[in-house]
Amino acid sequence: MGTVPEASGGEQAPIVAAEAAPVAGSAAPATPTSGLLVVDKPRGVTSHDIVAAARGALHMKKVGHAGTLDPMATGVLVVGFGNATRLLNHIVEHDKTYEATIRLGQSTTTDDADGELLSATLPERWQELLALPVAGGPQSAGENGPVNAAKGSAVSAAKVADDGSAYHPHQEAFLPDCQQLWRDRIDDIIALQLTGSIEQVPNTFSAIKINGQRAYDLARDGKDVQLKARRITVSAFGVLDVRFGYAPTRQLGLPLVSAADGLATTERDDAEATPVIDVDVRVSCSAGTYIRALGRDLGAALGVGGHLIRLRRTRVGGFDVSSPNVITAHVETREYTDRNGNHQSRNRAVLDVIGDELAGKALTMLDAVRGTMPLLAITDQDAVNLRYGRRIPYDIHGTAAAYLPQSGEVVALVERAKRGEAKPATVFGA
């Protein structure tokens, strides 16, 4: 039996379709009848919009995706077509990696930038939070105010204004020592409360079903939505950058620009702007993890609220956004007049490759299962037995893809029946 490591382990290299040597005079590659497209979803369209674009490009109806991405999110969306749609339930269970920006100091109804602003709490809580001990190290009083003994940084209480925001003597800005305290607290809370095996309450505006109805539909109708906590695993939660500045309360979802780009982040141009902290993170986690909920919970633990303003999925199992097989897409806006005479607009997704180029980037059925589960090489007689629903004499663990090594044909998905035997779970036509 030949096997490959399961993609959900997070250690497998990105899946790349095998390339055949070019043959002089050969025809252009035909799009396989079954396989996967790894699409880099753009912001502003739904996952279903990507599926619709794939249906049009592939000229087939049997198309689906493995794991919804919100309209504001970008990144890896694995799209299956033909027989490979039977793999999607397996792919969706793989570990994933995300890059995101969490905005601390503002909370929203949906825990992301698409919701309505609920609160902007950093100014009112500023002095109180600086007085709190930093997890992981005792805090003692210094000459100029509180000192984190573990980190050795001091904060001058005299430089904290009446509204709670911190200023330099000649320029409105967050004090460098305040910034270090915040970074320390963010790191400590992530390490102590948001990493490892944890209980997470999903977001109210989520696709989870309650008595047959989506939670987000109930929430939009004003219903009280109560979701139970779920056990998830966050294997890595790293902070890439922390930026301090001001954001208008009426304008959500615009990340602070790093000072390294030559634009100041600490000037208050708008009287309605409030202090915020933008935290860029990279998270690797199990299936079922809500990155919006991690942002919400980080803000709650700090006592200032938080929401997600940027989300990009960079990996699903062994399918990585850096793979040469990734297909990009763009957004087009369609203007139209509805039956009531009202002017409307709607975004749609368009794949950036079609025809021969699409065929070259599509993963075949064998490439698809190789990135999804272990492989099991079988004989022609084994294939006959599987197609008649019979067991075959192989000792496997979990689910594997049975294939014919000579032709590369994937015959069935098989699972352990008893010691030394495997039984067909899903059989594909010859």
Task: Label the predicted regions.
Residues 1-42, 47-69, 120, 129-166, ...:
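Accessory RNA 3′-end/elbow-binding domains used by RNA modification enzymes
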Residues 62-92, 204-205, 217:
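Glycine/acidic-rich beta-strand-loop module
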Residues 44, 82-86, 106-107:
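Short, charged/polar surface micro-motifs in flexible loops or helix N-caps
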Residues 34, 74, 95-98:
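Short glycine-/polar-rich loops that comprise or flank the Walker A/P-loop
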Residues 191-292, 297-301, 312-313, 408:
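Non-catalytic interaction surface on structured domains
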Residues 184-194, 201-202, 384-390, 396:
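Phosphate-interacting basic helix/loop segments used at nucleotide- and nucleic-acid interfaces
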Residues 90-199:
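Acidic, low-complexity central loop/insert segments
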